[in-house]
Amino acid sequence: RYPDLRVFESDFLRMSPDAVAPGAIAVIGNFPYNISTQIVFKVLEHRDRFTELVGMFQKEVADRLCAPPGSRTYGISSVLAQAWYTMEPLFIVEPTAFIPPPKVRSAVIRMRRNEVTSLACDERVFTALVKAAFNHRRKTLTNALRGFPGLPVVPPKFAALRAERLSVADYVELAQACGPP
């Protein structure tokens, strides 16, 4: 029925996308909760190959990935995932769906790669900037990014804000304000 469908059973963190198939790859899985964030970061690293991911995650991880700016759960993984993928929470899976039931709730989400696969800034600077801002999430960006390479002064419109208040577009704008890496 699905002549183009190929199923690979392997250690996702060790496999090379090139060894799986040429071209676009969609990932579907019930990921081990202890490595699910690493799986997402591998997808982000190879975003030119991974067009979509549908997976079950611990609910807290799914909430973080899908969180909007300004929410308590918005963080590094939210910004980086949303920079290249559209995040869609699909449904929650209660512990009673499993035998034995886990102590945590689960959620299934879909990540669809955006049409624009590159940002309007240096992506290494963007990633480093997001990580630096959230490493001091309770500080204003002026203090959190003090000494960040290429950014002598945080632009005034961001200076008094905290990391969780900025959208992906805001982080792109901040990265553009930085000099070359």
Task: Please state what every model-predicted region is.
Residues R72, R137-T140, P181:
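Short secondary-structure junctions and interdomain/linker hinges
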Residues A97, S106-R113, S118-L151, F158, ...:
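An accessory alpha-helical subdomain
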Residues L44, R146, G179:
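Short, locally clustered residues in the helix-turn-helix/winged-helix DNA-binding domain
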Residues D48-R49, P155-A159:
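Short hydrophobic "helix-edge" motifs at membrane interfaces and signal-peptide entry regions
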Residues R165-P181:
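C-terminal beta-strand-rich structural cap/linker in extracellular carbohydrate-active enzymes
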Residues R1-L129, E173-Q176:
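Catalytic cores of RNA-modifying enzymes
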Residues R1, V20-A21, L145, P152-P156:
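Alpha-helix C-terminal capping segments
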